[in-house]
Amino acid sequence: MTELKNDRYLRALLRQPVDVTPVWMMRQAGRYLPEYKATRAQAGDFMSLCKNAELACEVTLQPLRRYPLDAAILFSDILTIPDAMGLGLYFEAGEGPRFTAPVTCKADVDKLPIPDPEDELGYVMNAVRTIRRELKGEVPLIGFSGSPWTLATYMVEGGSSKAFTVIKKMMYADPQALHLLLDKLAKSVTLYLNAQIKAGAQSVMIFDTWGGVLTGRDYQQFSLYYMHKIVDGLLRENDGRRVPVTLFTKGGGQWLEAMAETGCDALGLDWTTDIADARRRVGHKVALQGNMDPSMLYAPPARIEDEVATILAGFGQGEGHVFNLGHGIHQDVPPEHAGAFVEAVHRLSAQYHS
């Protein structure tokens, strides 16, 4: 077993005792940091940054040099799998990710390959191995993937969407085609995450960014069902240590009980869910991650500290809480406000772990 100097994050996910509440931030390696912008400029474009193991490692480590974070998260993108399937990923200025060959029908789905994680996605595994080496056992490394539903939204819509009318048309008019796509994606995500674990990821997270746009019935059928399949197929132990799995559906606070039944170790909460209520509902089954509104980081540090105190009190005494934002950090947040947030979590949480 590789020695970890700080295993708070892994212990909290398994609802084991810790000295203080662990904290990390979604998108902690990102554009709010001037050093990230410099490395991104050096890479040339976003996907070149993802595909260069040394540069991906550098931006992964940047926030850890600034803040005493309790975990590192692989620097990558959720759209690596659709890109490896040959959909022609590119980034349009001001538009976000786009695909030159979106999925429009069952025939398109039939043609999609299931990518080999050590071949077409080998650059991700190289990044994982490089980051693990450079972390030198300081903190654990989180691997991740998008959920099948969330990946499918981009693949069918051809990019980002506000209304999701194209994929919902497929969902209601040709559900068989969508289920075939989701099944293929579930197999791809399972292989991809297991390869990340074998390469050195010590915990994995599934980001279901767009599950919250579905009705309850559709969420069960088109999103949660496939995440459950992935959880069932994941390696849960590696290098002599349990590998915790976190599910995060943005806008999914009403479905926590169903999510907790998947066999995952933890659930991510966005800021619209009350953490005290979430703990009452599912805290006996899973750990909880979250859940400060990312926009709170625009506030003065004293106000950030008040919000941290409120969320810690909401979760209350005992184990099973990883502090995080309710979604990714915004790109124009002052870096010192992020530092105040991390410091406040550690300082104010000790009283809950005595």
Swiss-Prot record:
Q: Which residues bind substrate?
A: 27-31, 77, 154, 209, 327
Which PANTHER family does the record cross-reference, listed alphabetically?
A: METHYLTETRAHYDROFOLATE:HOMOCYSTEINE METHYLTRANSFERASE RELATED, UROPORPHYRINOGEN DECARBOXYLASE
One GO-annotated biological process of the protein: protoporphyrinogen IX biosynthetic process from glutamate
Q: Which InterPro entries match?
A: UROD/MetE-like_sf, Uroporphyrinogen_deCO2ase_HemE, Uroporphyrinogen_deCOase
What is the name of the protein in this document?
Answer: Uroporphyrinogen decarboxylase
Tell me which residues are marked as the site Transition state stabilizer.
77
PROSITE patterns referenced in this protein's UniProt entry, alphabetically: UROD_1 (PS00906), UROD_2 (PS00907)
